[in-house]
Amino acid sequence: MPVAKDLFPEYGTLATGENEPSRNIRRAQKLREFQNLELPPYLAKQVAAKMAEKGLAVEATGGVAVQRIAGGSQSGQKALMGASSSALTKHTPSASQPTTHDSLTNLGANLTQSKPAWHAPWEIYRVITGHQGWVRSVCVEPENQWFATGSADKTIKIWDLATGKLRLTLTGHIMGVRALGVSPRHPYMFSGGEDKMVKCWDLETNKVVRHYHGHLSAVYSLDIHPTLDVLVSAGRDAVARVWDIRTRDPVVVLSGHKSTINRVKFQASEPQVITASADETVRLWNLQAGKTMTTLTHHKKSVRGLTLHPEEFTFSTASANSSKQWKCPEGDLVLNYDDQNAIINTLSVNQDNVMFSGGDNGSIGFYDWKTGHMFQSTQSIPIPGSIESENGIFDSSFDKTGLRLITCEADKSIKMWREKPNATAESDPGLEWKPKIYQTY
């Protein structure tokens, strides 16, 4: 009489029972399914200890633990369980190692991990003051000569990147300035503010030459396409608007979010628009069709941080205590970053795969982009004369070389960071890395 196969053995056995051949078949199926996964050394020791408690033989062969399972052949039941510095790294199957231990059945959805590269720690080398309100936005011009900051004091200030000295103050907004961007193709700078306005500044005359009307509430973010003459802006009205820079006409209106859009970016190669919203979602939009391609619902709180890698087709998003990396253009989840105990307001990444994360409580994290490991954690310190609560970080940007970082903060200051000179892996090893099992959820 045939015996039904138990599809959920972890929840109990079928009442009809199961004979020994059926159990061996099911075990062999699991072994084949996970034959190319390898355990990190510390997990291999734990598994070996558990198997010893169950009375199953575990022997060491050339530094690799091999388990013999009763009821099956030795060649079909050897399991690689150690001898690797990376966690769950995939390797090419061979006849000598066709299968792994069936304790790996719970690890099927885990991501490949590798040891992170060493990065030098970062330190503050300059503090700039001059704004009379919270500094809410920053952008670096394409030639890497100066950068601009926008503030709640309604002004835009332009600073020399090398010396940190004030070059110019621009006035024109009647409320706080929340977004800035400099065109890589034209001598224009764009600004968005709480006055619902998007302004185009001629950098040769330092005057406003265009206004873009349409937003029904404050503009929180904007971005300029690197190759097309279009601009995207978004904000509290939950809509992203794409504009023709020259004619000021709206090209397309991207609607679908249910709450404030905190960040918006162009992904030039598709072309795509990526938006991060307070409705806890991230949307990827087809720019030509003006429709949503993908909605990412993995975050459980308002998504405030968004950054694109300058050399890869990947991007990262952040909300309270959660940062995630995604792949363009589909929006596939790549990895979860180490936790940061803060509501994260801003993310930035440079060419050297260093990602900066700044929180509303002054929490700062530096991450390895490839692995999600936080190699440095520190805290912003308010400048003298500020109250303790004024240590939030609102915006950040690396310069074009990736060697300097600029942060905008609630203490009305601008802080500039660089890698610690003469740092080595021996003198500054950073936070300890341990392999973890990240779930794709």
From Swiss-Prot:
Functional summary from the UniProt entry: Involved in pre-mRNA splicing and required for cell cycle progression at G2/M.
Organism: Yarrowia lipolytica (strain CLIB 122 / E 150)
Protein name, UniProt field: Pre-mRNA-splicing factor PRP46
Primary location recorded for the protein, binned into one broad class: cytoplasm
Residue ranges, annotated region (Disordered): 1-22, 81-107
Presence of the UniProt keyword 4Fe-4S in the record: no
Segments of skewed composition (Polar residues): 83-107
Family: Belongs to the WD repeat PRL1/PRL2 family.
GO biological process terms held by the UniProt record: mRNA cis splicing, via spliceosome; mRNA splicing, via spliceosome
WD repeat windows: 130-169, 172-211, 214-253, 256-295, 298-336, 339-379, 388-427
Keyword annotations: Cytoplasm, mRNA processing, mRNA splicing, Nucleus, Repeat, Spliceosome, WD repeat
Compartments where located: Cytoplasm; Nucleus
Domain of life assignment: Eukaryota
InterPro entries according to UniProt: G-protein_beta_WD-40_rep, Prp46/PLRG1-like, WD40/YVTN_repeat-like_dom_sf, WD40_repeat_CS, WD40_repeat_dom_sf, WD40_rpt
Gene that specifies this protein: PRP46
Annotated GO CC locations: catalytic step 2 spliceosome; cytoplasm; post-mRNA release spliceosomal complex; Prp19 complex
